[in-house]
Amino acid sequence: MELWSELQSYQNLRRLLELASARTSSCWRILFGSTLTNVIYRAKEEYSSRFADLLSHNPGIFASLNLGHHSFFQEIVIRNLDFSSPGRTVSGLAFICFILDQWSAQTHLSQGYTLDYMAMALWRTLLRRKRVLGCLPAQRPHGLDPVQEEEEEEENLRAGLDPSTEL
């Protein structure tokens, strides 16, 4: 089981969070989940009291998530997760699953939205950290090749300027 290969795809990460959350039955988790799913679920159950204690220090997290103020969640939770080793990665995923369970239990938002938001926030953080560590190459934004851009600039010297005023 290669941990990082399972976390590279958004769909895999979303499915992993869904199967490790409380919304999935034990039977379904055993039949259709991976070993990683079961490990994350067990870690979430074992450390639930510690996770609850961590969340009690920041009581406004769920209120801000319900109101759509996601920057508070990003600052308090996501930026403090550590993915430097497989054990820390599993505990970070278990903590996100715990937050997902707590948020789903007390929100008016759909379960699909809460799952999608948590998966996307976590996936973007994983990609950003892998790029910083040099594991993943930075990709150029979609557009023209640099050579084509230079050729177009040479052909049309007034590109981007105000149109000429002719009488």
UniProtKB/Swiss-Prot annotation:
Q: Where is this region: Disordered?
A: 143-167
User: Mainly localized where?
Assistant: host cell
Q: Which Cys-Cys disulphide bridges does the record give? A: none
PROSITE patterns named in the record: BCL2_FAMILY
Query: One GO biological process from the UniProt record?
Result: symbiont-mediated suppression of host apoptosis
Alphabetical UniProt keywords: Apoptosis, Early protein, Host cell membrane, Host membrane, Host nucleus, Host-virus interaction, Inhibition of host apoptosis by viral BCL2-like protein, Membrane, Modulation of host cell apoptosis by virus
Supply the Pfam families for this chain.
Answer: Adeno_E1B_19K
**GO cellular-component terms in the record?**
host cell nuclear lamina; host cell plasma membrane; membrane
Entry function: Putative adenovirus Bcl-2 homolog that inhibits apoptosis induced by TNF or FAS pathways, as well as p53-mediated apoptosis. Without E1B 19K function, virus production is compromised because of premature death of host cell. Interacts with Bax protein in cell lysates.
The entry assigns this protein to a family as follows: Belongs to the adenoviridae E1B 19 kDa protein family.
Q: What is this protein called?
A: E1B protein, small T-antigen
Question: What species was this sequence derived from?
Answer: Human adenovirus F serotype 40 (HAdV-40)
